[in-house]
């Protein structure tokens, strides 16, 4: 499993053995996901100047690489094959849910979340990548919303 403790990213087996730190870039580590093949971790990094990035680091002592810079994401998640990311911007002026294509590093806004706490909007894909779900309290109470992507992405 993977974890963030005292600002550092680490991995260990389920019984806690083999615990070790993983190489990361400088900044605050946010959400972390295993890459679908289990060989690397994808994580959200916020730099000291407020910029955010999705980065990838190999679990077995490899290099840390930039996947894409983002529009100040508060949260993100990959689709089933790791080719597209759903992101939630942390801006009150532009509270967007966006898709980020890994291959082109281009973003596409799909809707506004208007959540009072953007990090809790937590956009995630359906297993086939044809819907994005997110949470928002824009109507005064927490609710889960779904956006159908209408074939924008290939099924996974």
Predicted segments — roles?
Residues 1-4, 21-44, 69-88, 115-132:
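Conserved beta-propeller blade repeats
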Residues 4-22, 39-41, 46-66, 84, ...:
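Beta-propeller blade-edge and WD-like acidic-aromatic loop motif
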